[in-house]
């Protein structure tokens, strides 16, 4: 039988504004702004890498700052991944625990139309510039302990952030 999906409530502009006003975490604020201004799904947001972002001063000045959405972060069953023979998997993150039955990966989106270029509002582009600077500071602070996967949304040691972390915040 077909699985019934719950319909999700769509935030109004007022609810979004209240959420942003109540948000005191810069990373979460950036995630909310990117999700709404660029219509990003959670996996696309968390799979965003710096090589897919154009936030050069010239691009921002000309209103051409953009992101290229070509991958998503997803936790997949190791057996299913073996069956796929690596198809659609762009990168497999090292496991945190040896005994897990799943793996965290960057994979291509489900549909070709999900691959897209999205232009950024200037305010969001400037937030990304600040995030990049913050990550550079973390790299200096943590040195060799910082694992650089080139992710926009990463923990303080560079490792990926999963969706449930954002959902809990």
Give names to the regions the model predicted.
Residues 41, 76-77, 161:
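Flexible loop/turn segments at secondary-structure boundaries
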Residues 36-38, 73, 124, 157:
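Short, flexible loop/turn elements at secondary-structure junctions
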Residues 1-50, 61-64, 113-115, 144-148:
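Basic, Lys/Arg- and aromatic-enriched nucleic-acid-binding interface segment
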Residues 15, 48-137, 141-149:
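Conserved tyrosine-mediated DNA breakage-rejoining catalytic core shared by Y-recombinases
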């Amino acid at each position: 039988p077909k699985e019934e999906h719950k319909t999700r409530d769509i935030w109004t502009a007022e609810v979004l504004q209240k959420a942003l006003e109540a948000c005191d975490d810069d990373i979460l604020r950036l995630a909310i702004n990117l999700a709404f201004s660029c219509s990003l799904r959670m996996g696309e947001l968390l799979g965003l890498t710096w090589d897919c972002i154009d936030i050069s001063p010239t691009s921002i000045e000309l209103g051409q700052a953009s992101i290229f959405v070509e991958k998503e972060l997803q936790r997949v069953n190791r057996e299913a991944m073996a069956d796929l023979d690596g198809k659609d998997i762009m990168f497999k993150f090292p496991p945190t625990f040896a005994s897990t039955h799943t793996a965290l990966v960057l994979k291509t989106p489900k549909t070709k139309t999900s691959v897209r270029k999205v232009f950024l509002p200037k305010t969001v582009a400037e937030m990304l510039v600040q995030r990049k600077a913050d990550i550079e500071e973390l790299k200096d602070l943590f040195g060799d302990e910082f694992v650089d996967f080139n992710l926009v949304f990463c923990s303080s040691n560079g490792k990926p952030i999963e969706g449930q972390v954002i959902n809990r915040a």
